[in-house]
Amino acid sequence: MQDSPVGVRFGDYVSAFTSGGTIAAAWDRGEWYRRGYQMGMEHRGKGVDVQLGPVVGPLGRNPKGGRNWEGFSPDPVLSGIAVAETVRGIQDAGVMACTKHYIFNEQEHFRQPGGFEDFGFVDGISSNVDDKTLHELYLWPFADAVRAGTASIMCSYNKGNNSYACQNSHLLNYILKGELGFQGFVMSDWSAQHAGVASTLAGLDMTMPGDTGFDTGLSFWGTNLTISILNGTVPQWRLDDMVTRIMAGYYYVGRDKTAVPVNFNSWSLDTYGYQHAYAGAGYGLINQHVDVRGAHGAAIRQAAARSTVLLKNVDGILPLTGREKFTAVFGDDATENPYGPNGCSDHGCDNGTLAMGWGSGTSFFPYLVTPLEAIKSEVVGKGGVIQSVVDNYAYTQIQALANQASVALVFANADSGEGYIEVDGNMGDRNNLTFWQGGDALIRNVSAICNNTILVIHSVGPIIIDEYKNHPNISAIIWAGLPGEQSGNSLADILYGRVNPGGKTPFTWGQTESDYGPDLIYQPTAGHDSPQDNFEEGVFIDYRAFDKKNITPTYEFGFGLSYTTFSYSGLRVDKITAGEYTPTTGMTKAAPTLGNFSTESADYQLPANFTYIDAYIYPYLNSTDLKTASMDPEYGVDVELPAGSQDGAPQSRIAAGGAPGGNPQLWDVLFSISATVTNTGELAGEEIPQLYISLGGPDDPKVALRNFERLSIQPGESATFHADLTRRDVSNWDTVSQNWVISSYPKTVYVGSSSRKLPLSAKLDFGGY
């Protein structure tokens, strides 16, 4: 298995794909599937069985969350559809997808125990979330991933309601495996397992290194798992269940037929070296340098361009022609990292153009086409003049060049990543929502002089840019996100009109940081073993929070301009006969046991002449006495185990369950929605009509996204938008009945071009449901 959600981590001759948080802006099922399939093919070509991605945790509760860029969107429906298509793509390529991080993993600060005793804590942060918010927000995209057949789910570092996610029986056994009917295996994040038997019985199926410390050879499992089975603490059926779940995923994606031997090494790009790097063992051929990229560069260029969002375009200044009298390019973000595109470990720096965040969710760039080189190629090829200043702090030179420019392209960025790397004082999470590397001063310097300034943003999420939206000299603003290896080419395709922008922002751009509601916890209060993060806002994050508090955003969720214009008309709602919702009833079968095994500890001793590799974890015993073999001073001490977790007898089925993703009737289509979208401009373009619903209750969002479709329309022509509303789409989670219910509140559907531009609406008739 291998990271990452944007490509094969540590591999050479691999692609650096557009990030999840950027390609979400394409709002295109086909684009998400293709990206998943291409990533899957590259992992498969390198010999990887499990791709550690995609990501829907973090969902994006706060825009400063360090790993938001690895996921898709703070909207659960947009994220849910994107993750489902990505899972299908990865697994159709013959690789198991590992959807992560389950669940409530919404910030990097304090995600793991240790290192913050000064605050009075010894454990990782606890995300405290109510049942309604769990189901209607954070669990929603995981349910979509399960329904799409994800072979694996990774549990997260944090606690959920004061129980670590990787030993939280309610979240793993009851919700994930019970209610959602997850058939695959749950694996821990690295160092996310904090107990042995408790994790086993709570639903953890596979552990990753670091549970007791990296490179120690010690584990809560290994020898201890063998002991817990021999002494009866862990029943046989649970071991069989763990193995079955792992192998089910293996066969489900056809690894028995499509597996490729591993042909690279995570710890070295050298051709020859140690297969077991830490132990210094197994010297030989470790890297065959297999090129798995195929034609993916062209696909990445297309995906990044189709994910680019045009936020401002005064008087149609864009697209440019390349024949402007004098093109000036400003900013470190326009050019290359002086140390090379892979010059910082896990991309843990902000040097040069930003095309990927930092951390374990990264991959090496095979190359990185910078904006400056792509723009220069465009302008020079058409006989134009182009000059640049890429030092953000060279104010004298910046002002001199801005005075000459007929068009000024200013590049600025904001980065984030995983918490084990600190960049410019940002420990994974962003400290604020401003530009990095003096970006704001750069923009102000140029725009104060050049009255035709175009701002290009590469960022992990929203930035406070209201000043620039309203600046008379800033003619256009483009958000290009984290586009991957084809950054410059995809941007040039937009700037010079080869691609008509059609992306829509997958998050809200606020006027101030406080607009977003609860902040991340940077300075926790004492009083508990863990910092306590109470998700008191419930389902009201991002645009839902802005709507609830009547805050006007700079740019609303779903917003994006085009070089053409569109109109909406002819909303139609057709009611579909689906019958009444029936809760799942009955009993499960007893947990099966598969064969027999020896209970004699002598049969599990380290085999004679066994070649032991230092710091590797093995299941063998070093003594026939289980207590001695465990090396656990608390062996035999009674501990509290998850209630019912040792009981393999038939269990009552969960009313909201019954199939992967939940009760299968949740996906009954109750309404079919259609509308006409007309291209009223002079250029062919793509529009993304969006379907929202008001569920009508006092505790419901004003509107919530439920569906969308990306349409390609020629000038003067129309296309029909089609979208279904399922039972789940029109339901609320009822905490009393523990099921989805359609409330009696009146419900309205809306169709339009963004969450705040919804010209079409209709009431829904629920008679018969």
Question: Which residues make up each language-model segment?
Answer:
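A glycine-anchored, Pro-Gly-centered beta-turn/N-cap motif
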Residues: 738, 743-745
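Short beta-strand elements
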Residues: 757-769
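Glycoside hydrolase catalytic-domain context in secreted enzymes
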Residues: 1-648, 658-732, 745-751, 755
